[in-house]
Each structure stands twice: as structure tokens, then as C-alpha cells.
Amino acid sequence: MSSHADSNPWTVPALAQAKRAGRKLVMLTAYDASFARTFDANGVDLILVGDSLGMVMQGHDSTLAVTTADMVYHTAAVARALDRALLVADLSFQADATPERALDAATQLLQAGAEMVKIEGAGHKLEVIRYLVEREIPVCSHLGLTPQSVLRFGGYKVQGRGEAGEQLRRDAQAVVDAGASLVVLECVPTPIATQISAELSVPTIGIGAGPGCDGQVLVMHDMLGLDSGHRRPKFVKDFLAEGGSVAGAVRAYAQAVRDGSFPDAEHAYAA
């Protein structure tokens, strides 16, 4: 049972209320008004304008080429279509290198219609998170596999196994202590993601992090089974195949997240 009336717009405080009520959060990426409107009307709680647009919209091999101007353009397009879902937008590569740069980029994104900005990593990013939150800008943290760090990681690999899992737990608590209102966990083994989700006071959103998170997110192209030109990750499921239409696929995805049937073991990583 939902603790949030379907007709009510989502707010940042409502996310924490959903966690306390045990209500799973449904998130998808979107990059234009048409898809965003469809997602908003069919049960999606949060829309992410991700820098993944560099790969699925622009054809790059990574997210590194995406600029703040790109993010502002797509954020504004999506924002015009939303009535209910809460809009989150990524800070692009190195836009959060310093607190001042992050404030400039985040201000542009909020002026374009975003209600929260997403920042990858912990470490020196903790200062950035605190700086933004102190200036009334809601922040979503992104931990685990952080795509902007692909060169350092040597590819898109599972993060948080073994001793790295303990560091991930510490990082997750640190970003919340710095003021993050939401934490995305990407490509993290199910046991550690479940443990982190239980420990944090704010919701976690998983992508390849198992069913123990407080919600799930997928890139829309992956959820619809579209060929992005890249190898399909283990955690991806084609909901268009069973939904029969884009709207049907979104409803099937939302229902599967809420009833806990997605992700299952086939779409998650073991310890």
C-alpha cells in the first residue's frame, strides 16, 4: 500500500516518509518531454536526467563528454512534462570538482527545473555535498560504480566486494552525515547494499544492487530493451517485452519494483 497519494507531487521530505513506511521508490531516467510525460503518468516517482545521456543520446563511450549545458538543456525539457515525479539531475564530469563550481552548475539545473542534484563519490565530494546543502540545494549521492570514474576503475565493474564493502558502508554514512537526502548504489553486491539500506536514515536507490534497497532505477533505454550499442548489464530487464507498449512497460516495471519481484537473483550480484 502506498503511503503517498498517487496524485500528490513528490517532495524531498516525502522520500524519507516513504522509506519509513516501507514504500519502494520507482525511478527511471528520461531525457525529453515525451518520455518523461509517459513515465510521470504511469507510476514513476522520481525522474533522473542522467549524464548517461552522453552514451544513450549522444553516442559516446562514457559519460565524460557531457557538459553542464547538455544537462541544463535536457533537464529543462523533462521538467516541462512533469506533474508528479520528483526531478533529479546529474552534475556532469568535473562540474563538482570544487564547491563553487558545483554551486554554479547546481543553480543552473535547479533554475531549469531540477529539484535535486546527483553527485558521484564521497571523499572530497563530502565538502561539496555540505556546501550545496547549506545553500538549500538537495543532494542525491551516487556510490559504488560511479561512471565518471570509469578510467580509474578500468571499466564498468562491480564495486564493494570484500574489504571494499566496509569502505562503501563508511562512505554511505558519510554522505548522509554531509546532508545527502538520497543515495544511489550502483553495481554493489546484494548483501552489502541491503546492509547499507538498513543502516541509513535516507532512502537508497539501487541499480544492480539487489532487492534490499529502498527503490530501484534503470536507464530508460535498458528498461525498454533498446540496443544502446553497449553490452547489456546483468541487472537489466526488458519490460517492454512483457508490457506491450511503453506505458505498459513502465507500469510493469513500477509494479515489479513495488512488489519486490524486481530485481531478482538473476538481475543482481552476489557477495
Swiss-Prot record:
Its main location: cytoplasm. One of its GO terms (cellular component) is cytoplasm. GO terms for molecular function: 3-methyl-2-oxobutanoate hydroxymethyltransferase activity; magnesium ion binding. It is an enzyme of class 2 (transferase). InterPro entries: Pantoate_hydroxy_MeTrfase, Pyrv/PenolPyrv_kinase-like_dom, Pyrv_kinase-like_dom_sf. The active site is at E186 (proton acceptor). Its cofactor is Mg(2+). Keywords: Cytoplasm, Magnesium, Metal-binding, Pantothenate biosynthesis, Transferase. HAMAP family: PanB (MF_00156). Belongs to the PanB family. Homodecamer; pentamer of dimers. This is 3-methyl-2-oxobutanoate hydroxymethyltransferase. It comes from Xanthomonas oryzae pv. oryzae (strain MAFF 311018).
